[in-house]
Amino acid sequence: MKDLLISLGFDYKENAKDVLIKPYTNHEKYSIEINLEKNNINFGDKIFFNDSRNSNQNITKPEDLVVLECVDRLLKKGYKPQNIILEKVYPTGHGTSGRLDILVTNKDNKAFMMIECKTWGKEFDKAYDKLKKDGGQLFTYFQQDKDAQILVLYTSELINKKLEYKNEIIKIEEEYRNTSNVKDFFDRWNKVTKNNGVFNDWNTPYNYESKALTPKDLIDIKQEDSSFIFNRFMEILRHNVVSDKPNAFNKIFTLFLCKIMDEK
């Protein structure tokens, strides 16, 4: 955990050996503190849990650190701390409720962005599969607050001393606001997510803008990535009852390569 905090820019607080602090100069020196001895996060005097006045959280699971890193990224991007609500409670039906990890509101205190945080790897992939299957938690929460403009499935991890993050983003279209339930929303959704437009250099806070990928956005493929891509292709081909799967895979992959070369 300490390596992650240092990579985020936290430093030891003066005269407090077990407390790390990070000031955010773009928010009038707003700060977040981490008490290593108590395993506790103090999100400051403007970021609260579920509209309460509580800003403290005990770190009990790895996902808590993903939420912390996401909040840090939001603050650095320019989102105001008073517009960030943690563990926002929404009814989920049949007398139950769920907690949205992060709700970002706009200047009018209306929902702008709903963020569900997951740990890197299996948990994120599982949530992404659920999202594509029936909408998952994010679609359920949106049905309770249709002012939201963006739904985000988010993860991050410190890999080889470099902080990596992924986000799958759904831009809310006006027709989605007219849906009566999660299934109706899911049926109308075009099943397409974006992976940029929230934390990129070209966009500003409270304004979502996604862009098409270009060759400079490409990264070297890893062994685990190639296996993941292959398995996803096979899943799509099976779903569409394609018999000659290896040949179909090769042709689709070749088309992608041609498209990449054509964009250069």
PLM regions with names:
Residues 1-61:
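Interdomain/boundary linker segments immediately adjacent to catalytic/signaling cores
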Residues 17-33, 58-59, 82-109:
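Active-site metal-binding core of divalent-cation-utilizing nuclease and nuclease-like domains
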Residues 54, 59-86, 256:
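Short, well-structured hydrophobic secondary-structure segments
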Residues 61, 65-69, 97, 133-136, ...:
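Short, well-structured alpha-helical interface segments that form or flank functional binding sites
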Residues 70, 100-106, 111-124, 141:
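Conserved catalytic cores of phosphodiester-cleaving nucleases, focusing on short active-site segments
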Residues 80, 99, 111, 146-149:
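Short loop/turn motifs at secondary-structure junctions
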Residues 85, 89-91, 124-181:
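Nucleic-acid nuclease catalytic cores
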Residues 152-264:
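Charged, often flexible domain-edge or linker segments that flank or initiate folded functional domains
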